[in-house]
Design a protein with these regions (language model features):
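N-terminal amphipathic/basic-hydrophobic helices that include classical n-h-c signal peptides
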Residues: 1-22
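N-terminal phosphate-binding caps/lids of nucleotide- and nucleic-acid-binding domains
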Residues: 18-428
Length: 428
């Protein structure tokens, strides 16, 4: 290769040599660029379900039905009762970078919707065939579109109820290599089911229904009761024992990270991290920082090599989180990561301390703190921001209500955690 020769020899070479060694820069064709973009957004059937679910939730839907066949590889349908798409906007649905959620660059600094990139529908249609039927309240007819290879191939007007139905068929029909790397149909179905579980946890006010191969493995009522959702996911016995995390009334004016949700007791451990669900401002994310804070809060309460379970709903100012990191929108960056780490750890830790005695000394080691499984109140306040001056007291009736100091809490320092979590993965 020319690059391996000394400069003096390179200068003496004839020009014909360079013609064969130089790779000219070319502008990618629309077809190739579409496939590259689609590959980042649509990795597997569950990716399609995720994008369609987020569109439905952003549209204000209160009922969402998901139907799949062959693990979503042959067909995926998502039907909602949301606002629908006005006739004037329908032709733009499958255009790349077309969205109703962002207008200016400043909007990217304060994103409040689940979707915002304007790539989902375009990317899905680039790797499958998509049929969209939609209607709105104030229009007499709705619209039907069929898109293929990123282009609309059919369009008509039909009578339809308000809401939207999207049916995706023959996923990766022109991508045999991508189909080859998909897992079994049952494994892909499992990924979709897990995804629907997650969205139902963060939106208990929405009724979800999942139909797979004509069976209904999962549904929720939309009653806005997180414990009812957990009953649908894990069963009544497990859900009834879980601990609910709520914001204390005295902290309503707090402007830092607010941690709420539901979590398992120390007896409800799992063999891996796949049952740790983290949501930031209603968005499911993967975060080593938050996951590690959640785990470390259980230190001393459960055995080593076991992992907690639960769903934490964390709210922070939108300007303190950057969700525009990756097209999949599951990776985010935090402006005040240490504050978030501390708030999560204190919220979870204090929940556990309300249910277990606080010893006068709490040596580190493999010992497991005794947990009172019978004392599980239906609701209790647990959030405690790290910057508030006063120190929480134990509300366990079995304790002497002494002040819980950092030595008792065994709270892991944020700086130490950064070093300790180098090999940590959020879901394993």
């Amino acid at each position: 290769m020319i690059g391996e020769l000394p400069l003096t020899e390179v200068l003496s070479l004839p020009l014909e040599v360079f013609e064969h060694d130089y790779m000219a820069i070319k502008i990618l064709s629309p077809e190739v660029s579409a496939r590259i973009a689609a590959g980042e957004v649509v990795e597997r059937p569950a990716s399609v379900v995720k994008e369609l679910l987020e569109n439905s939730l952003d549209a204000g839907s209160t009922r969402i039905r998901i139907e799949t066949t062959e693990g979503g590889i042959e067909s995926i349908s998502v039907i909602d009762n949301g606002r629908g798409i006005p006739e004037v906007d329908v032709p733009l649905v499958f255009k790349r970078f077309a969205t109703s959620k962002v207008e200016t660059a400043e909007d990217l600094e304060a994103i409040e919707t689940l979707g915002f990139r304007g790539e989902a529908m375009y990317s899905i249609s680039a790797v499958s065939e998509v049929e969209l039927v939609t209607g709105v309240d104030n229009e007499s007819t709705g619209s039907r579109l069929v898109a293929r290879d990123g282009e609309i191939v059919e369009q008509s007007f039909i009578a339809v109820n308000p809401g939207t139905k999207v049916k995706v068929t023959r996923l990766f029909r022109n991508f045999p290599a991508r189909r080859k790397f998909l897992r079994t149909r049952s494994a892909e179905s499992g990924r979709i089911k897990t995804l629907v579980h997650r969205y139902s946890m963060i939106r208990p006010d929405v009724a979800f229904e999942l139909i797979q191969e004509k069976s209904r493995p999962f549904s929720t009522t939309g009653s806005n009761d997180i414990r009812n959702v957990m009953s649908s996911v894990y069963g009544n016995e497990t859900a009834n024992q879980m601990l609910q995390v709520k914001l204390d009334e005295v902290l309503r004016d707090w402007r830092g990270p607010v941690v709420m949700g539901i979590m398992g007791t120390p007896a409800q451990t799992r063999a891996n991290r796949s049952h740790i669900n983290i949501f930031i401002n209603g968005r499911w994310i993967q975060s080593k920082t938050v996951s590690y804070a959640f785990e470390q809060a259980y230190h001393g309460f459960m055995a080593d090599r076991r992992f907690p379970m639960g769903a934490l709903d964390i709210h922070i100012p939108v300007e303190d989180v950057d969700v525009n990191v990756h097209p999949a929108k599951t990776e985010v960056r935090f402006r005040k990561e240490s504050d978030l780490f501390g708030s999560v750890q204190h919220a979870v830790r204090n929940t556990l301390l309300q249910l277990a005695p606080v010893p006068s000394a709490s040596p580190r080691g493999n010992s497991q703190r005794q947990f009172n499984q019978d004392h599980v109140p239906a609701t209790h306040s647990t959030f405690w921001p790290t910057s508030i001056g006063s120190i929480p007291k134990s509300e366990n009736p079995n304790s002497d209500n002494t002040i819980i100091r950092p030595g008792h809490l065994e709270v892991v320092d944020y700086a130490d955690s950064v070093a300790n979590r180098q090999s940590h993965t959020p879901h394993g």
